[in-house]
Amino acid sequence: MSVFVYPGSFDPVTNGHMDIIQRAAKLCDKLVVAVLVNSSKNPVFTLEERVDLLKCAVKGIDNVEIESFSGLLIDFMRKKNSKVIIKGLRAVSDFEYELQMALLNKNLDSDIETLFMMTNINYSFLSSSSVRELARHNGNIDGLVPDCIKDKIMDKFRR
């Protein structure tokens, strides 16, 4: 069984992430979307909220599972018996950072492969931080995030 892992903060999940999830899910038997507990980041949405938002967003994609993890991605990959990391790229600037991470992971485990997927051009401008900024100022996030989570995101910033 082929198991791919798509790691990220997903703070919150966007339609750019969903584009990668939907396309990557077609390439493997199981896609694990791994929500990172990152001590160097200060997420707006709690870990539980990010997992819940993703679970709502991936309903109907049968071979996708949502899990959280902390620590090294390589250790999580071993637990999942996975050899493939999925990374979405919007621009060359994403590639520079992700290439460094891919080389580091390859150095830690030579069997690990990183599969880079270009985001659909319609989402090349989109980031979780831009969604948060729009929501923070009561801007329109229609079409930027899955419909099933739009109100939850806006509610987070109305508090």
From Swiss-Prot:
Cell location: Cytoplasm
Pathway note: Cofactor biosynthesis; coenzyme A biosynthesis; CoA from (R)-pantothenate: step 4/5
GO cellular component terms given for this protein: cytoplasm
Top-level taxon of origin: Bacteria
Gene3D superfamilies linked to this entry: HUPs
Enzyme class: transferase
Enzyme Commission number(s): 2.7.7.3
Keywords: ATP-binding, Coenzyme A biosynthesis, Cytoplasm, Magnesium, Nucleotide-binding, Nucleotidyltransferase, Transferase
Cofactor(s), by name: Mg(2+)
PANTHER family hit by this protein: PHOSPHOPANTETHEINE ADENYLYLTRANSFERASE
HAMAP family linked: PPAT_bact
Record-stated family: Belongs to the bacterial CoaD family.
Protein name stated in the entry: Phosphopantetheine adenylyltransferase
